[in-house]
């Protein structure tokens, strides 16, 4: 039994902690990984086999990131891992490569060899895509289990006995409970990605039940951008003598990210937003708002102003969420308006700017939001629109980061000249939402049909362009 079996785990069900705990050497406490004398410059130097080195090269991974360089050797030795790294640091590769390499060592690769849990559907699909890309040349099969997708189709996929299962806790538990012939009783690897989010109350029961039915003798990788108290307690409960690899401070942003904020009156926030967008023509931009309704309203308003904007939120069906993401990734639309459903783990290449239209009440969400840009060593820009009611939340963000974010001034005349046109566009957007059944209960039949709205949304004649030359 674990040496510290009397550890209090307030946030976790005590029975689950007991069920999840595995025999742990040295009390199950993590060991800090010793940094290598020289950071390996190739995947081959890390011990990755040639087949996977070739797969990395095909994906454009020329050299390992810092977290990959520090985590992969320990994972290849069969150690449990705690990996802490900033968003965009390459955490997926850090656990996917060792799992695939362990599978390659088997004479007959085992079905249902590894399971990866993700807090969001989009991140689950992204992880699945990376597994398939890395394993494409060696016949790796992967199934993604998330809500919003037909369960019968997923059951058919599970019947084919994939090597890897990636899913959200709720849908995975549905299949463990209801899908005949499916179990994880021979599972060799469990990965908890974005672990701090997985420990939220909305996932707790499903996660508890999953931990109760999988083998205790397994390798467990726990990855997160932040190390919270809950993550620390989970680590003591279900990892065996883990190695801790940390490539970031507890809450931090990358050095290549430039951050600023505007202090704006609440009634003029839309005007400041349009001002910022006009300063960034052609940029790939993610705008974060607080509610699902706000994503739709803001997308319609901006489209009425001739911006190429699309929204994504938790109220959309899975097909439409993926469709919106694909339109953004392919640059069909260069502005993605989203709730915090898009702040975790999504690896969208080329995001230049993150705009916090609504300031998050949870300071840690700010770190995840701005982590959508300045990824993999690239530069990025994050700007926040802070009104008088959000100033306290923004101060809490600065306290968490440990530094003050510089403010940016703007000529009020430039803002005021935008007000009338934006008001017209917003009024038209509100009318469109009302006529289309803007409230959640009325919208079920044609839920979040962005393309239909884009075709039918009326456009004010006054709002043809907001280029600077038009304003003067």
UniProtKB/Swiss-Prot annotation:
SMART domains associated with the record: DEXDc, HELICc
GO cellular component: cytosol; nucleolus
Main location: nucleus
A single GO molecular function term of this UniProt record: ATP hydrolysis activity
Deletion consequences: Thermosensitive dwarf mutant. Reduced plant height, root length and crown root number at 30, 32.5 and 35 degrees Celsius, whereas they grow similarly to wild-type at 25 degrees Celsius except for a slightly reduced plant height. At tillering stage, plants grown in a hot climate show narrowed leaf blades mainly due to a decrease in vascular bundle and lateral vein numbers, and all internodes are shortened.
Domain Helicase ATP-binding span(s) in chain numbering: 72-245
Function noted in UniProt: Has ATP-dependent RNA helicase activity in vitro. Acts as a thermosensitive RNA chaperone required for normal processing of pre-rRNA intermediates. Required for normal cell division at high temperatures. Required for a primary metabolism adaptation to high temperatures to support thermotolerant growth by regulating gene expression. Partially rescues the yeast rRNA helicase RRP3 mutant which has repressed cell proliferation at 38 degrees Celsius.
Entry remark concerning the domains of this protein: The Q motif is unique to and characteristic of the DEAD box family of RNA helicases and controls ATP binding and hydrolysis.
This protein's name: DEAD-box ATP-dependent RNA helicase 10
Gene from which this protein is expressed: RH10
């Amino acid at each position: 039994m674990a040496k510290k079996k009397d550890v209090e785990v307030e946030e976790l069900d005590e029975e689950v902690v007991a069920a999840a705990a595995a025999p742990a050497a040295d009390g199950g406490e993590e060991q800090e990984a010793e940094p290598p004398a020289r950071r390996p410059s190739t995947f081959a130097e890390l011990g990755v086999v040639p087949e996977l080195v070739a797969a990395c090269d095909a994906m454009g991974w020329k050299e390992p990131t810092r977290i990959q360089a520090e985590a992969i050797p320990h994972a290849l030795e069969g150690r449990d891992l705690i990996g802490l790294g900033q968003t965009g640091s390459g955490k997926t590769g850090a656990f996917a490569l060792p799992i695939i390499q362990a599978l390659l060592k088997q004479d007959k690769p085992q079905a249902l060899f590894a399971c990866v849990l993700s807090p969001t559907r989009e991140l689950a699909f992204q992880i699945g895509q990376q597994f398939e890309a890395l394993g494409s040349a060696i016949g790796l099969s992967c199934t993604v289990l998330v809500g919003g997708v037909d369960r019968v189709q997923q059951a058919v996929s599970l019947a084919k006995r994939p090597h890897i299962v990636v899913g959200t806790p709720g849908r995975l538990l549905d299949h463990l409970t209801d899908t005949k012939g499916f179990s994880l009783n021979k599972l060799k690897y469990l990965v908890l990605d974005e672990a701090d989010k997985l420990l939220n109350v909305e996932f707790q029961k499903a996660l508890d039940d999953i931990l109760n039915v999988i083998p205790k003798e397994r390798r467990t990788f726990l990855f997160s951008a932040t190390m919270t108290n809950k993550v620390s307690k989970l680590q003591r409960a279900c990892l065996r003598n883990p190695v801790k690899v940390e490539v970031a401070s507890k809450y931090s942003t990358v050095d290549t990210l430039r951050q600023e904020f505007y202090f704006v009156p609440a009634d003029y926030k839309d005007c400041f937003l349009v001002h910022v967008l006009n300063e960034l023509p052609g940029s790939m931009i993610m705008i974060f708002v607080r509610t699902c309704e706000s994503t739709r309203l803001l997308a319609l308003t901006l489209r009425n102003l001739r911006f190429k904007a699309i929204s994504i939120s938790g109220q959309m069906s899975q097909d439409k969420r993926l469709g919106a993401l694909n339109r953004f990734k392919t640059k069909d639309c260069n502005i993605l308006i989203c709730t915090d459903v898009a702040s975790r783990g999504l690896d969208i290449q080329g995001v230049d700017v993150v705009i916090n239209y609504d300031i998050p009440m949870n300071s840690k969400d700010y770190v995840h939001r701005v982590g959508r840009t300045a990824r993999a060593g690239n530069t990025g820009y994050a700007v926040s629109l802070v009104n008088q009611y959000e100033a306290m939340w923004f101060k809490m963000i600065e306290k968490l980061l440990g530094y003050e974010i510089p403010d940016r001034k703007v000529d009020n005349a430039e803002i005021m000249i935008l007000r009338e046109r934006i008001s017209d566009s917003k009024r038209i957007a509100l009318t469109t939402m009302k006529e289309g059944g803007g409230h959640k209960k009325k919208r079920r039949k044609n839920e979040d049909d962005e393309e239909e709205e884009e075709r039918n949304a009326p456009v004010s004649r006054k709002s043809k362009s907001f280029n600077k030359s038009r304003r003067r």
